[in-house]
Swiss-Prot record:
Protein known as: ATP synthase epsilon chain
Source organism superkingdom: Bacteria
Membrane topology: Peripheral membrane protein
Primary localization: membrane
Gene field: atpC
Pfam families: ATP-synt_DE_N (PF02823)
Length: 135
């Protein structure tokens, strides 16, 4: 299988940089997969789990929004936050969700809508984590 270069960058670190076979990305308009030779494309990311396949192994990384650019040079993702599942503290993640739920009653209007959307994304990630743990 042909490979391409992939960079995943967050404000804190370069989370990944290297040659890969495929990257599955949680796009705002729907999830999409990237292979070598993909057409140029720019997309916004939603919070979700990014799957990187390289050399027959998969690495899963949580991203909390950002921007993806596919060009002839490869795929670059600028993520608001990028955390490998290996680094994730699932107890702290669950506590974050509980805190978000508790603060919903303090929000109104558009702020409430955004808070609910973010909470839904976090709950979806948590559900995916629980499903991943079973496999």
């Amino acid at each position: 299988m042909a490979t391409f270069h992939f960079d995943l960058v967050s404000p804190e670190k370069i989370a990944f940089s290297g040659e890969v076979d495929q990257v599955d990305v949680p796009g705002q308009e729907g999830d999409f997969g990237v292979l070598a030779g993909h057409a140029p494309f720019v997309a916004t990311l939603r919070p979700g789990i990014l799957t990187v396949t390289a050399g027959g192994t998969q690495q899963k990384i949580i991203v909390l929004g950002g921007l993806a650019e596919i060009s002839e040079k490869g795929l670059t993702i600028l993520a608001d936050v990028a955390t490998s599942l290996k680094e994730l503290d699932q107890t702290a993640f669950a506590a974050e969700i509980s805190g978000m739920e508790a603060k919903l009653n303090e929000k109104q209007g558009n702020e409430l809508d955004r808070a609910i959307e973010r909470l839904d994304h976090f709950k979806t990630i948590q559900q995916q984590l629980n499903t991943t743990a079973l496999h």
